[in-house]
């Protein structure tokens, strides 16, 4: 399997509860390396641009307001099959459907406040990483 990079966002519900370290431990235990990381506070306009693919979905306003409500941690994870592995570690979008031991099963408050975001494909991973990081910030 190829070495990949994927974007991970630790969302406001998790940063507010100081879960960054516990969440990152799960990524590292799964064999993913954190090759870039920063804590930022998105503006509403930035959140709307990042989640623009969902602009016509009914949850867009609630999602973007939530993502701009408090700081988030954006990071790049690297490893063999990193995109699929990250999604496995995160668990199902709805924590009620997530497997035991996943981030969302352990830490998510609801389907809306589900603690983490992860890229879903190589193309979106590249776009999402470039949204937050320059090449100089990626050290692996």
Swiss-Prot record:
Cellular location(s): Cytoplasm
Cellular component, GO annotation: cytoplasm
Active site (catalytic residues): 117
Residues that, per the record, bind ATP: 11, 59, 87, 93, 104, 114
Enzyme class per UniProt: transferase
Tagged with keyword Nucleotide-binding: yes
Sorted UniProt keywords: ATP-binding, Cytoplasm, Kinase, Magnesium, Metal-binding, Nucleotide metabolism, Nucleotide-binding, Phosphoprotein, Transferase
SUPFAM superfamilies in the cross-refs: Nucleoside diphosphate kinase, NDK
Keyword Metal-binding: yes
Enzyme Commission identifier(s): 2.7.4.6
Gene Ontology annotations of biological process type: CTP biosynthetic process; GTP biosynthetic process; UTP biosynthetic process
GO MF annotation list: ATP binding; metal ion binding; nucleoside diphosphate kinase activity
Pfam families listed in its UniProt record: NDK
Family: Belongs to the NDK family.
NCBIfam families, A to Z: PRK00668.1
Subunit structure of this chain's protein: Homotetramer.
PANTHER family: NUCLEOSIDE DIPHOSPHATE KINASE, NUCLEOSIDE DIPHOSPHATE KINASE DDB_G0292928-RELATED
Protein name as catalogued: Nucleoside diphosphate kinase
Native source species: Cereibacter sphaeroides (strain ATCC 17023 / DSM 158 / JCM 6121 / CCUG 31486 / LMG 2827 / NBRC 12203 / NCIMB 8253 / ATH 2.4.1.) (Rhodobacter sphaeroides)
Lineage, top ranks: Bacteria, Pseudomonadati, Pseudomonadota, Alphaproteobacteria, Rhodobacterales
């Amino acid at each position: 399997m190829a070495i990949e990079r994927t974007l991970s966002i630790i969302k406001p519900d998790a940063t507010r509860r100081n879960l960054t370290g516990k969440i990152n431990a799960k990524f590292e235990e799964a064999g993913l390396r954190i090759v870039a990381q920063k804590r930022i506070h998105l503006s509403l306009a930035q959140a709307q641009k990042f989640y623009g693919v969902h602009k016509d979905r009914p949850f867009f306003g609630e999602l973007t307001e939530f993502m701009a409500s408090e700081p988030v941690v954006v990071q790049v994870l690297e490893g063999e099959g990193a995109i699929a592995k990250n999604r496995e570690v995160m668990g199902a979008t709805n924590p009620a459907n997530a497997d035991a031991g996943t981030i969302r099963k352990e830490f998510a408050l609801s389907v809306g406040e589900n603690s983490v975001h992860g890229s879903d494909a190589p193309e979106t991973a590249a776009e999402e990483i470039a949204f937050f990081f320059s090449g100089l910030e990626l050290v692996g």
